């Protein structure tokens, strides 16, 4: 594999020599940093099992190597990447997998390491959504996830990835993470803080990642990380689990941030060792039980992961100074709720008691029940999924609801051929040889929902959202 030129500041190299355990080779570290990163994917088990996915893609000639810390994660090699980018494959468009760096699968693996079943989880720095979608899959789309993102421009990307993966149990917020300890004290069973960092571990993906690096900036970033971790720890309920992670390599942003929390709340913090997270984890283990992953150890990005438990309650932080404002939704109950549910079920949209119906003017939404106790405490950018818009003749069902809720074996399901599915993704109407009998059609491909559509004569009218329409080659094996 070809090497690429990585920019290394002298002070960074000095710092790494001091930080690296004697069991690791510094020369191997430099060599690993200059190798391009191996591509990796995570199968979305909300949509398909690992076994079924492997059977589905077997004819494609993709080479998949299991990632040891994530059962549904694989390093991938493909011969047709130039002709068909991985993100343009039908399987990616329908949410069957997420393109995710192998190291970044570690934090969620750690969060669920003891096979715990948290009902309310926060992902404090969530965009672009790889870890939020991984958490949702581990939760089976049940309970609730508060996915927060400080960057306004990245919230839209976060929502797009959540929607593509068929996730229904998520609320999105747009805050500085430092507000949550005060705003939502001891409200979460589990929290992931994948903290903003200096990014020293990502040079294999971005050779210029260290262009603006300095020891002073590391210290400034670590100060922010301590404040974020303090906030996250206050938002965690006693007995809850918190995972702190970064994609950087220095001790100041990693071990020392966690040790600061332990020193500050000595009677409340318990470090949970990660030595048995996966076979060979001990190669990256620190004396504290954290994982400090240098890139040469597992041939991946550099990463740091710490797992801890809150063993006692903490005094509350000062109340936040902001006003949440009036919540514009009202619960939908009784006859109205029954009418919506029956109409949705008739076209193949199904949900359980984990989701509750709410209404805003003509909009009908489904909110995760576990998030309802947070209403009035924070302002949401988006909550749950938009199910429908009501109109004189019934309901206009929304695309994100179809992707998350549709039953592909429903009586109105209509399976497209590969050629027809490609036309669908291009935004074109479908003219099947044998049109469906029903007027309302649940369009599927590979037994996955692509959308709800209307049959007009012998034509299926395309309803794929314009902003998602693709062109060019989309399907492996098609000419």
Curated annotation (Swiss-Prot):
Highest taxon above the source species: Bacteria
Reaction catalysis annotation: cytidine(1407) in 16S rRNA + S-adenosyl-L-methionine = 5-methylcytidine(1407) in 16S rRNA + S-adenosyl-L-homocysteine + H(+)
Record-linked Pfam families: Methyltr_RsmB-F, Methyltr_RsmF_N, Methyltranf_PUA, YebU_pre-PUA_dom
GO CC terms in record: cytoplasm
GO BP annotation list: rRNA base methylation
Residues at the active site: 247
Sample GO molecular function, one term: rRNA (cytosine-C5-)-methyltransferase activity
Cellular localisation: Cytoplasm
Main localization (coarse): cytoplasm
EC number(s) stated in the UniProt entry for this protein: 2.1.1.178
Binding site for S-adenosyl-L-methionine: 125-131, 149, 176, 194
Entry keywords, A to Z: Cytoplasm, Methyltransferase, RNA-binding, rRNA processing, S-adenosyl-L-methionine, Transferase
Membership in a protein family: Belongs to the class I-like SAM-binding methyltransferase superfamily. RsmB/NOP family.
Function: Specifically methylates the cytosine at position 1407 (m5C1407) of 16S rRNA.
Protein name, per record: Ribosomal RNA small subunit methyltransferase F
Organism: Salmonella agona (strain SL483)
